[in-house]
Amino acid sequence: MQNRKKILTTCAFPYANGSLHIGHILEHIQADIWVRFNRMIGNEIYFICADDSHGTPIMIKAKKNKISPEKMVFLFYKEHKNDLSKFNISYDNYYLTHSKENYRFCKLIYKLLKRKKLIFSKYISQFYDCKINMFLSDRLIQGKCPECNSEKQYSDNCNICGANYCSTDVINPISILSKSVPIIKKSKHLFFDLPKFEKFLKKWIHSGVLKKENLRKVSEWFKNGLKPWDISRDAPYFGFKIPNEKEKYFYVWLDAPIGYLSTFKNLCDKKEKIFFSEFWDVNSKSEIYQFIGKDVIYFHSLFWPAILHGINLKKPTKLFVHGHVTLNGEKMSKSNGFVIKAKTYLKYCDSDFLRYYFSMKISSCAKDIDFSLSDFMNKVNSNIINKIVNLASRSSSFIDKYFEGYLSYKIENYELYCKFTSLKEKINKYFQSNNISFIIYEIIKLAELANQYFNKKSPWKLTEESKDKRNKLHEISSMGINMFYIIMIYLKPILPNLSKKTEDFLNISLKWENINKPLLYPHLINKFKPLCNRITKSQINYIKRESTIK
């Protein structure tokens, strides 16, 4: 067994102003697979997330729905937590940023940064809506991105190219609230002095924390020099008030990443023998891994590590960056309803199936992943049902009928068995590097090999009463069970539902350290029951109908 690591893993926080869709779920599945594997090999790992619970969109939606922002945030928090649990996302703590702990951390960090002269104030030009007499924060303005010219972008950052810019730089601005053209008015804001961290950040991003493709993107932001970061917003705003400032609030992108600290502290307070300093102390030997989408890499690779460095806390060990999920080749959009909600999917399909389909496409690169319902159905039925589960069904039918559930005394084809077990280190590396699609490729090759073996041996021809044939039948069927057993050990972090049913069926836990130990007599398996069902066209049609997808 390797040296036991201490690891903290986080996902970027879902925003508490709407239901989750399958695009959101990708990141949580990706991280959960990585976490489950690390638990499986014996690492001490904690997995946390929270709802991002502040900001203008929440304030606006709550007002529109005639509900308080606090109540709306809590309702979505409960919904998100429930959806994620049904996808078997195994968080040790799922919290929200609108919490006492997070406000305490925000005030403390602000105080520390200010003491180090890393916070300064200055008057800025800001959009102001004369029709409703209020300053307009970033999410209340839409216009054309000044970097890539994409239309309908918010005035703080672009969802298309990822650029972060001054709100008044947006082209052809329009107020979302009144649909009028805003004027520019002066307002005092507070800034975090990001340029002071340029030397540190250049070194940090080259420390192995980012993949080369992400590194190239982040490096571009240094070309024109880093700019101070506006960490304040004018009232009205739903968030935390800034101490000793009138009508000023912490910008959501300041308090949201601080939520990584407060959510973990909340876990430490609830559980014994988990110590905050063991993970966040600057000299800690623990490791911190963060799973994020490519659209928030700017905040996680520049602002957040700079703040951690400014307050002398540990920086992330690695950022795993993923792409977006497209639907039939098109970008999903909440505004026009072109999404598959998490709860709609769960109503009709096993959560394992989405975990599997995404796993076929997850790699360490930040490429977009396309979701096609027809391809989803075909791949799940072909690979999980026909190739993997069917292997268990075919093998167990003979074990149950002729041998009362007992497996044979020996492995029928030891060379083939070793082909299955010899992939252990390769698959270990793929899990650790987050190249899950490579694992699926290897596993499907194994499943095909197992079924070819079974077909070639034709055990159904060996059911006669002769002792030699019965022994051979026993060994071949037990070989099929052992190949299925190894496949399912490899798949355990990916398919928790199927793994639990497999453990019940095989009468043994699926443990990484047992891969090289075959199941032999007197091991007894239980009578086979269907482990999962095929996806039908009617299920797909129901999802399409409820998601208004053609």
Curated annotation (Swiss-Prot):
<dbReference type="InterPro" id="IPR033911">
    <property type="entry name" value="MetRS_core"/>
</dbReference>
<dbReference type="InterPro" id="IPR014758">
    <property type="entry name" value="Met-tRNA_synth"/>
</dbReference>
<dbReference type="InterPro" id="IPR029038">
    <property type="entry name" value="MetRS_Zn"/>
</dbReference>
<comment type="function">
    <text>Is required not only for elongation of protein synthesis but also for the initiation of all mRNA translation through initiator tRNA(fMet) aminoacylation.</text>
</comment>
<dbReference type="GO" id="GO:0006431">
    <property type="term" value="P:methionyl-tRNA aminoacylation"/>
</dbReference>
<protein>
    <recommendedName>
        <fullName>Methionine--tRNA ligase</fullName>
        <ecNumber>6.1.1.10</ecNumber>
    </recommendedName>
</protein>
<dbReference type="InterPro" id="IPR009080">
    <property type="entry name" value="tRNAsynth_Ia_anticodon-bd"/>
</dbReference>
<keyword id="KW-0436">Ligase</keyword>
<feature type="binding site">
    <location>
        <position position="148"/>
    </location>
    <ligand>
        <name>Zn(2+)</name>
    </ligand>
</feature>
<dbReference type="InterPro" id="IPR041872">
    <property type="entry name" value="Anticodon_Met"/>
</dbReference>
<keyword id="KW-0963">Cytoplasm</keyword>
<feature type="binding site">
    <location>
        <position position="158"/>
    </location>
    <ligand>
        <name>Zn(2+)</name>
    </ligand>
</feature>
<feature type="binding site">
    <location>
        <position position="161"/>
    </location>
    <ligand>
        <name>Zn(2+)</name>
    </ligand>
</feature>
<dbReference type="GO" id="GO:0005829">
    <property type="term" value="C:cytosol"/>
</dbReference>
<keyword id="KW-0648">Protein biosynthesis</keyword>
<keyword id="KW-0479">Metal-binding</keyword>
<comment type="similarity">
    <text>Belongs to the class-I aminoacyl-tRNA synthetase family. MetG type 1 subfamily.</text>
</comment>
<keyword id="KW-0030">Aminoacyl-tRNA synthetase</keyword>
<keyword id="KW-0547">Nucleotide-binding</keyword>
<dbReference type="InterPro" id="IPR014729">
    <property type="entry name" value="Rossmann-like_a/b/a_fold"/>
</dbReference>
<dbReference type="InterPro" id="IPR023458">
    <property type="entry name" value="Met-tRNA_ligase_1"/>
</dbReference>
<dbReference type="GO" id="GO:0046872">
    <property type="term" value="F:metal ion binding"/>
</dbReference>
<feature type="short sequence motif" description="'KMSKS' region">
    <location>
        <begin position="331"/>
        <end position="335"/>
    </location>
</feature>
<dbReference type="InterPro" id="IPR001412">
    <property type="entry name" value="aa-tRNA-synth_I_CS"/>
</dbReference>
<dbReference type="GO" id="GO:0004825">
    <property type="term" value="F:methionine-tRNA ligase activity"/>
</dbReference>
<feature type="short sequence motif" description="'HIGH' region">
    <location>
        <begin position="14"/>
        <end position="24"/>
    </location>
</feature>
<keyword id="KW-0862">Zinc</keyword>
<dbReference type="GO" id="GO:0005524">
    <property type="term" value="F:ATP binding"/>
</dbReference>
<feature type="binding site">
    <location>
        <position position="334"/>
    </location>
    <ligand>
        <name>ATP</name>
    </ligand>
</feature>
<comment type="subunit">
    <text>Monomer.</text>
</comment>
<feature type="binding site">
    <location>
        <position position="145"/>
    </location>
    <ligand>
        <name>Zn(2+)</name>
    </ligand>
</feature>
<dbReference type="InterPro" id="IPR015413">
    <property type="entry name" value="Methionyl/Leucyl_tRNA_Synth"/>
</dbReference>
<dbReference type="Pfam" id="PF09334">
    <property type="entry name" value="tRNA-synt_1g"/>
</dbReference>
<keyword id="KW-0067">ATP-binding</keyword>
